[in-house]
């Protein structure tokens, strides 16, 4: 990103998108996502290079830092049991969404939600629960419908 700014014109309206930290999350092994992502974020966001980059972007313009989703430490979610666990495992396997139509279950509160999106119908697991699955359950997820996954920062800086 730094080289883009150095070679860019004096335009004030820029949009930068970066794959960090998602790319890191996908590179980490099972059970390591939360700890390694936290350490990496602390290192990156406290570095002099990062803050010099932010200062350069914020000088003479409005800088907004945001994200397209949040993260949930699903490894700390309580285990579902009984019929709920069986339904979630059968429906979602090790994930939290499934393309297509299907039963959303008779559970109160609901454990699944049906949506029709531009990409077709989907079932989504809702709530803070996890279930046993072959290969283990991910300790950190993103892109789902839990509160932590839909919260996104919105930070505005001007210099």
Locations of regions flagged by a protein language model:
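Feature captures the catalytic ectodomains and active-site-proximal regions of enzymes
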Residues: 1-159
């Amino acid at each position: 990103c730094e080289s883009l700014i150095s070679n860019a014109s004096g335009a004030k309206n820029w949009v930068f998108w970066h794959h960090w930290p998602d790319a890191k999350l996908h590179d980490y092994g099972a059970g390591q996502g939360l700890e390694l992502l936290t350490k990496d974020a602390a290192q990156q966001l406290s570095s002099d290079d990062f803050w010099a980059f932010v200062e350069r972007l914020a000088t003479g313009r409005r800088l907004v830092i945001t994200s397209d989703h949040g993260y949930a430490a699903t490894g700390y979610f309580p285990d579902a049991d009984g019929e709920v666990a069986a339904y979630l495992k059968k429906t979602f396997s090790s994930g939290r969404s499934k393309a297509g139509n299907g039963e959303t279950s008779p559970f109160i509160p609901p454990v699944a939600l049906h949506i029709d999106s531009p990409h077709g119908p989907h079932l989504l697991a809702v709530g803070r629960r996890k279930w046993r699955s072959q290969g283990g359950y991910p300790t950190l997820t993103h892109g789902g419908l839990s509160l932590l996954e839909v919260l996104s920062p919105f930070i505005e800086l001007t210099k």
